[in-house]
């Protein structure tokens, strides 16, 4: 089944929901491997700049939720809601320690008058980081955080779109190595597991996507927005953090490119898409 939406509107957004990082992020956020310690002052500054790009530079209405020290991962709002058009699916995160993060997100999205669907099935798990919406269809990564039942509930929620599942073995989430870099353009990392996942997505889809291959999996996570006053906008990792991948993004001449630093969040597996949920509200005439 082909998606019934409008690909030309892909990437449009009027609002962004973000949440401030708590200091507990440094010691208690979930992470796949114990590496460098998070510099909290730097993490706060990077997050402020990220939010500033969305609000001041791009003109989105930013809904800023407060940090909660009892929820170390709460800055990663992407995992707790999937929004498409006027509907928001409040997820059931795969990590039990993150389940209470959904409460404040649900409240914020209710205030924006979205149709709210809650994932109540105790057998289902879904992290938004495993959900790639292309404008035509959904791909859902089956990972340690997201299961088949979670994918089924997403498919039931967004019935106008095809939903295909992709096994994710070596990464935290599907979007740990891919994202949309444009209306028909998938940014994908170069690792064997990333390329294997791309091949599965290509086989599952009726549509042929263009691909943008970057050397670094983490740098394949970028944010594409279609802002009427700015055109095609792409937030991507900085040349200082990922020099070779940044060179690939710089070839996208029809995009307004905005390099964004994310070194501290990455230490606890957070990437650019993790820290925002975008909503496109219809303007009442």
From Swiss-Prot:
GO terms for molecular function: amino acid binding; dimethylargininase activity; zinc ion binding. Keywords: Acetylation, Hydrolase, Metal-binding, Phosphoprotein, S-nitrosylation, Zinc. Monomer. Pfam families: DDAH_eukar (PF19420). This is N(G),N(G)-dimethylarginine dimethylaminohydrolase 1. InterPro entries: DDAH-like (IPR033199). Disruption phenotype: Mutants from some strains grow and develop normally. Mutant tissues do not show any dimethylarginine dimethylaminohydrolase activity. They have higher than normal tissue levels and plasma levels of asymmetric dimethylarginine (ADMA) and N(G)-monomethyl-L-arginine (MMA). They also have decreased nitric oxide porduction and increased blood pressure. They do not show differences in the structure of the kidney, lung or heart. Death at embryonic stages have been shown in other strains. The active site is at residues 173, 274. It comes from Mus musculus (Mouse). Belongs to the DDAH family. Its EC number is 3.5.3.18. Inhibited by zinc ions. The keyword Transcription does not apply. It comes from the Eukaryota. GO terms for biological process: arginine catabolic process; citrulline metabolic process; negative regulation of cell population proliferation; negative regulation of cellular response to hypoxia; negative regulation of vascular permeability; nitric oxide biosynthetic process; positive regulation of angiogenesis; positive regulation of nitric oxide biosynthetic process. The modification Phosphoserine is found at residue 33. It catalyses: N(omega),N(omega)-dimethyl-L-arginine + H2O = dimethylamine + L-citrulline; N(omega)-methyl-L-arginine + H2O = L-citrulline + methylamine. Zn(2+) binds at residue 274.
